[in-house]
């Protein structure tokens, strides 16, 4: 830091930038966002366009007393005007998150495409996601596949799981479960929790892979440890059914409980199945119906069939 300060004192643009960068993103004990702004603005004034996105980031993400979305947009726009890749990403985030502007995924996609066209893997992945889910733009699995493949080719780990899902479901391409599982395995190697979850499900159900309950259980646990909440539902399913493990409804409930608290419809669906079929608990069709109804209220449409089935019992 002191060496860069000496360079800044000699009016070195790199000195100003590096001091600003360290004050913003350096070791915690020297971080000082206000000082970072001063040095980064000086670097930007001297024509160092790379500083523009960092200034925008400080105004966009804080600390709270410095958040100013209008200023963030102003500096990002300066960067966009000179095709600075990180400023383009910052502008995309403003629109995708609705920070200081009306939330607009179409505008977000516009800036993501600009960044993707410049070879940015993060933008390729997020543009692929938008096209896959059709969030604010027309759903287009083929374009999703194209952008996710580009992100994967650029070694972006998160692309593995969604690209694999497209091949597994045959969306935008012919179904190819073998390739899907290879992508999940690669994602697992790269630490992608979603890939771990999908791979575990396929080991559990024997989908393109030999059934392997122990491997499935291990992968579900790894995914959960990395913050993948839906994997809890499938691990609980294994334990409620006693698949490759001792049936233990109390343990299974403790695993699935956070998903129930967070309103996952599929979690309520599983609990309905537990009471309908007496999986380690006494059968209770009334309780099952209440749980299926909750799942349906949370948007899990498959619960309707279960409700219709139970109508003849209660």
Protein language model features and the residues they cover:
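Structural signature of tandem alpha-helical TPR/SEL1-like repeats
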Residues: 1-3, 30-39, 65-75, 102-111, ...
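Canonical positions in the second alpha-helix
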Residues: 6-7, 42-43, 78-79, 114-115, ...
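Hydrophobic face of amphipathic alpha-helices that form TPR/SEL1-like repeat modules
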Residues: 18-25, 53-61, 90-97, 101, ...
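Terminal, low-structured helical/coil segments at or just beyond the last alpha-helical repeat
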Residues: 296-314
